[in-house]
Amino acid sequence: MDQLKYPIGTFSKPLEADERELEKWIGDLKQAPHLLRSAAAELNEEQLDTPYRTGGWAVRQVVHHLADSHMNGYIRSKLALTEETPLIRTFDEQNWAGLTDARTLDPDLSLALLDTLHLRWAALXESLTEADFEKAYIYPGTGEEMKLYQALALYVWHSQHHIAHIKAHRKRMGWN
């Protein structure tokens, strides 16, 4: 496994989740924007625009990618709750990260968005029943089913994965 690419390992989709795990994931979801803000704090423009690995995104793009991805994840969750196992739409995250907004805007814009989004998402999850967490959506192309408890675990991992990218990058570059 490439430590630069997967600093906390790859995602392992859980096959079940109990109430304790759900509560932990919801708490982790609430905490993630704060941890991301801390990881990216006090970086100057040059540092924000430095890729965390060869062929990887700049720190700025990582922050904006998390907002883009998690908005999609939140909407997918709402679709699964209101439609019968919907086929969701994917997005080209590489192309999105290459758009001008992801390459140039202040990361604080996406950090503020993530603060609010994660609070909404956590409140939604706190309102769900066990049966709700079993609802799912389908990825086009692969046909993979993602239950809502699995999606919650995925987006918590995704947050931690990119926070670890930024923290490890800062350490390698001596920016701590």
From Swiss-Prot:
Compartments in which it is found: Cytoplasm
Main localisation: cytoplasm
Any Pfam family the entry gives: DinB_2
Segments passing through the bilayer: none
Cofactors that this protein relies on: Zn(2+)
EC class: hydrolase
Co-factor binding comment: Binds 1 zinc ion per subunit.
Gene3D superfamilies given in the database record: dinb family like domain
Keywords tagged on the record: Cytoplasm, Hydrolase, Metal-binding, Zinc
Ranges in coiled-coil conformation: none
Residues annotated as binding Zn(2+): H65, H158, H162
Subunit structure: Homodimer.
Task performed by this protein: Possible metal-dependent hydrolase.
Protein name stated in the entry: Putative metal-dependent hydrolase BLi00869/BLi00870/BL03027
